[in-house]
Amino acid sequence: RQMCIRDRPFSVFDNPNIAFRQVYEAALNKIRDQATKERLLYGNWDFVEANDMAIYNSFDGSRHLVTGLKEKAYDPTKPLITVWDFNVAPQMSVLSAQIDYENRKVYILEEILGKPEEKENNTPALARKVRLKLYRDKHIGGVDVTGDPSGLQRSTTNEDGINNYTIITDTFGRGILRPKVKLLRKQPPQATRCEFVNEVFGGYEGWEIQIDIKCRKLTQDLIYQLRNEDGTKSKQKTTDPKTGVKYERYGHLSDCLDYLLCYYLRDSWYKFKSGGDGNGYVVSTSVIQEGFSY
């Protein structure tokens, strides 16, 4: 006869030594951090605190994270959007996405990280890494390159006319990838754009966001990024123990998500931002002023 055995988390209460159990339980009960207490006292390693101060409080892992999404949804014959964040610590970050406008679905397919230990936290190296990945995926649908508008600024180490986006498009080349840069003219106001992203997580105008479960850093941002009182992101810094470099632990991949939604769902973004019904708003000159491509 077959037995059905279910995995159950092991906790302090399973320890047969009663005296030890009582002392240990009393010590664990003094822990203030609820997440740590849940994990150590109850063996609940999947516990994620629903934090009222989390800025993306409409994100719901059970609803928005999908196992095997890239394998199910990615279409190499359709345009792929790559969204770039140019911070070098703790890593450089790229999100890849495709949007099904007909069914109002945003597919976040993959996060690609340029880590310092692999010397990939610079634009040329990460662009080469992404190019190789696109070749391996046999991508023929064209590639959009978007992200932080400040990436257009010329670095002091570069010549005139060279910036992060020209480096990416030059690396992708003039062949099969056909890169196009598409950017907002300036960064969308942080508090407003975070409210907008929350609304989209909640189904604003029928939109649905699906994120491949392998996007671990993005998921961490969505769970742990805290909100300042003015509605902006709390950009707390932490120090790398090896290098002594200070960096923002959370927010780089969620910034990519913000830029993606504000540019590619811009009808909804303008409507949300204006507080109106959006009718006729997007055909005004604000589109020309705020979004451009070259």
Where are these regions (language model features)?
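A residue-level signal for conserved active-site and pocket-lining positions in enzyme catalytic cores
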Residues: 10, 41-43, 94, 145, ...
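ATPase catalytic-site recognition across NTP-hydrolyzing enzymes
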Residues: 16-86
